[in-house]
């Protein structure tokens, strides 16, 4: 029997929701929906070790609103019916359950983690007073909140791991307010030696708990503790010391880990790119790249015959793949060509020269390259390459330290990396910033932030050809740290941005853009004047994400 909970419990603003919990009784050949459809996201499932009809489901609930069901649910009849478990657990309609785990020797002892979070287009509530760690010793009838040794105040995401041979030893990844002073228990790793009644703070560690935040204790040797995030924090002395190790799993972000209870050298990792297996305690890894789980954001095509399709994937770079091959087995993995790193997004190929390819990485990094010679040039608009930059922003540049200020010296902005452009904070770039090649002139390109940029020399120089085309509602603008207990703004939270651009071969001066906050803007004179035509659209809610605008190539005005 296999149980599957649907909906992504990692709280990115791109997280998908599901339709409840599924059950298979034939080893996965067929599945039946067993209910809990309105929970949207189920974070954990635990089956009673002595009675398989008793199943607990940790429902974190709707990410984008306080509707639907959330909390801890239980079935006593194999899923035919469900009840919400209360008895002291949060029931405020805002706090969901993210963790449920049985004591390995006594299933009457259960631990649950609760978490309050809410995403809005330009903000993120992560953490609250009602959440935290809860323990039951009477099979879930009553619960008490555990606070001894833990950080004071609000709590966020929680993950727990219990040692199998000695269940008194437990470890926990616990999110708290990052403003807690150093030296006091805060966000990071905790350990318990008395079955979860009290906790000791071991390590301050906060790498996007809402997205990573997993922890595992070696089932055989409790001295080995693994904190799973972007890379690992590892202890081999029971938490007295930790070191960071970026295992060469080639998986991008790591999200979950399983260690075989019978052999602690066997480990599985769940990553953005698939599963990884180690049989030597992480020294080497085998990548299972045979899963069809690639997540494309956007694609482009060239004019070769056979044509190539280029596209960017979540944490798997940007690739180009032919539409045909001479291989009798068809198109194989080896026919694809890696062209850029990171989170990959828009890929555009010069229609007159297939060797010239434009690639976009997350949050506004765009590059031009010759895919034959591998000559690579970053062309993101910067104060140095925007010809009319000072018409929009006044700034002073400190060349000796590669930084600039917009408020004479009060706040300095540094280049993120030496090989990457300097992005002024006035320009808000979407996680997937739109880039197109003009349908009128292959040397003309457009790039969107909250303003529209135009280049007539393939991105070497830029001109801002619009005001802020978004609503730029300052009352809704995100905080710089994302709004969570710990810094959660990784760029994906940027809002009030342009997300789609289109021009038309019928008239080189007509350009359309759509924004993530509902605007549809058009210029008929190459940016001199703009008109928001959003209100001309009936029956479409305000602030709706305009995912695509496509100007007709055949009829003017359409």
Predicted segments with their positions:
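Beta-propeller blade termini and top-face loops
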Residues: 1-558
